[in-house]
Amino acid sequence: MERLAGIEIFKGFSGYITKITDLMQSQDETTSGCYKLVSLEGEDGSIVNFVVALNTYFVNHSVVYIGDKVTGYFDELAPVPLIYPPQYRAIIMVKNMPGENVKVDYFDSELISSDNYLKLNIAMFTQILLTNGQPFKRNLENRNLIVI
């Protein structure tokens, strides 16, 4: 896949949280406890670790616990250490909820997702929010979006 400037290629991994541990990023005490290593086990038994940082966005500002089913999204083209289990920097974390579907992707000028599985039809009453919960009134075309 070719990387376009400023566009992340999102890839997700879903599984149940088996462990959450503090991750030391440096000797700086001001960030102590701010970084977590979240271990997920997929339904097929595969294991993935996500580094959750201060800038990781949790959809709906959900708090996650051991046993929760979640999906972690990372930049598929970002460099990663060659270790087992694989370890990715979590960009977005979604706590999977019954009856709720979440799509994280780049949407083009026709509001079609990069994998062509979803086309957005925005209605007058559609809530469009920034990650901080404030309304967004601009054009949605050619952007990375989280669709719930």
Pin down the residues of each PLM region.
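Short, flexible, surface-exposed loop segments at domain boundaries
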Residues: 1-37, 59-120, 132-148
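Short, basic/aromatic beta-hairpin or loop at an interaction surface
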Residues: 39-52, 116-126
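A cross-kingdom feature marking solvent-exposed beta-strand/loop segments within repeated
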Residues: 46-62, 126-134
